[in-house]
């Protein structure tokens, strides 16, 4: 393959991933190992429902609007990766988002068979921890860029609590606390690309996707990132990225029956060490 078609294919792949709002896989082609620390500032939107053991359908709750959880929070993210041979690579990633708050609800809410009347003061928390691992293969590769596919596992731990004055059925109003948690291990397929547009400047992008029923979960996951980095030293790079993550899941577990729609998107700054 000539240099020009390879460059065109790489550039098209990166732009396509970025257009989807499109990474730890986006490394310079000759980097063997890398570690990255990231400060991510997402805009968060969360909707949940939890049915009770008696089959009563739960209210769809907007955690930011109904329960006043913050919709903006800076969180750390950590990534590491290694190349195996010329075309294979392994990456791992972790980040978490913990939020809590208190609000007076403006409408009646049913959560796990508990009814909280309008005007009740509710305390809540929603914590998530995300672990991502993937193996990638670069099917197009040159000295300046690469385009590849990945197979990964996106594991998310969700913990939700809600407490306040409420009642179950016809029982008297009293303080009620409900907790729910779920662990969602979701396989993903992805595309990634990177291209060195100048001696120390790299652009890159990634998109991971899932849309199927896996065990107790049925729905969709989209996880994308686009980035630009500058190599300030031979082994140190700084950069900026934009990340978009969107879960839309129906959950059918003993500890959680209901729905979860969880979306966060926003910019990030990162510092990277390469070897």
Where is each model-derived feature located?
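Outer-membrane beta-barrel architecture
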Residues: 79, 134-136, 190-192, 225-227, ...
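Short glycine/proline- and aromatic-enriched beta-strand/turn motifs that initiate or cap beta-hairpins
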Residues: 25-97, 131, 268-274
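Residue-level signature of outer-membrane beta-barrel architecture
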Residues: 82-84, 137-139, 153, 193-195, ...
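Repeated loop/turn-to-beta-strand initiation elements of outer-membrane beta-barrel proteins
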Residues: 87-90, 143-145, 199-203, 235-238
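Transmembrane beta-barrel strands of outer-membrane/channel proteins
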Residues: 37-41, 92-96, 137, 149-155, ...
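Cleavable N-terminal export/targeting peptides
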Residues: 1-32
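Outer-membrane beta-barrel "beta-signal"
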Residues: 230, 262-275
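Extracellular/periplasm-exposed beta-strand and loop segments of Gram-negative cell-envelope proteins
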Residues: 45-74, 96-129, 156-184, 212-217, ...
